[in-house]
């Protein structure tokens, strides 16, 4: 690490602390509000993906609170020191929830295909290695984690690409959420190794990237709910075998015409031995 040491005048330092506190407060406030909101959604919808999303948010707060230091304002000193000592475990936690959210959001737990089994296998591997990291020195656990991180990106891209190829257009916000995460994750090590010159914005680039990612993930969840409602309405108004409007939709349309007192003629035709449009 090539973290620089800067000497500030008193007024400049006060402005720096004020700016840092402000951006930390925005980050923690937005994420905590998102957690509470999604907890309410879980109680209403009973979809476990919201619990996974909350787990990811809490892990992100713990990670950034330890890396940047604002965790001292959020929880007791003993907790902050313990999290700092077990920072690799926190990294495994956020990686675990990242893959779990990707799997459940894209509904692979419904498909049970080989991609789902690949995801579950990596989740179990991260769970085991994360547990072992409580007892392994950081200088040994860190290189292992970076290997797992590479596998995580590969598996997530496989899951996302397959769904995009099959027409999961409502997942566009989730795909976009990976862009700031990848950019922010690349900037932080470049800054720590001296490749990129240190600045206030560079120092907090990963924090802002996570904030943008979580906002886009929330938008993706909202888009997912909208899609599920549209599908539920479609199934309620269409016959699954023929893909044609069913009697419920016909009754609704006919009653609407009657309410408008419009002259209407209803003609019913029965086709024998008809199962689908392909049999005509």
Which residues are covered by each model-predicted region?
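Hydrophobic core positions of alpha-helical segments in small-molecule transporters
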Residues: 29, 52-55, 144, 176
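Extracytoplasmic
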Residues: 1-43
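Juxtamembrane interface at the cytosolic side of transmembrane helices
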Residues: 36-59
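Conserved nucleotide-binding and Mg2+-coordinating catalytic segments in signaling enzymes
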Residues: 232-252, 269-279
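Interfacial "cap-and-anchor" motif at the non-cytosolic start of specific transmembrane alpha-helices
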Residues: 59-104, 109-233
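Cell-envelope/extracellular polymer assembly enzymes that use nucleotide-activated donors
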Residues: 265
